[in-house]
């Protein structure tokens, strides 16, 4: 059975409500993994999830640990979450570069997928921060500077360009509309199998 390591798609929300003179705050946690988990498990894939706030303690820090998985997926998790653990950020202690570890994993035959979102590719206000990282090296696209999001509240439907490409096996030719995407440029030699927007 294939094993997939899915990283991200989780968040904590802090809310402050003001009601006249009075205010109060509350927090809650959410994650959005149910659809992709169900799809992968239906295809016979063993699904392992690391929420964003647990990357520091759970993401593999060795090539051997990462090699236990057939594929690594990043979804809405920023480069800072991957590469600024507390030992680096607060204590100035060098540690493993997780993004370089993923690049080496791919160079040795591992599969990597980045799913678009507010904190992947460059994301909202450029906060995804993957430009000029080891991850950009292994992606088949070039990342833009700054905020790469295109919000389309009217919905846009991706157009399949190469339906016979192996990655498209089992996928319908007509896709549902999306409400936003990350604008990216294909690298020379990359196969473009679908396109959206300009």
How does the language model describe each region?
Residues 1-4, 46:
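Residues that mark the start of a beta-strand
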Residues 41-64:
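A short, well-structured beta->alpha microelement
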Residues 7, 50-53, 195:
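Conserved beta-strand termini and adjacent loop/short-helix elements that scaffold enzyme active sites
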Residues 12-18, 111-197:
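An acidic, glycine-rich "communication" segment
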Residues 14-33:
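Glycine- and acidic-residue-enriched helix-capping/strand-helix junction motifs
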Residues 32, 36-39, 49, 65, ...:
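Stable alpha-helical elements in mature extracytoplasmic
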Residues 3-7, 11, 64-125:
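Short alpha-beta junction capping motif
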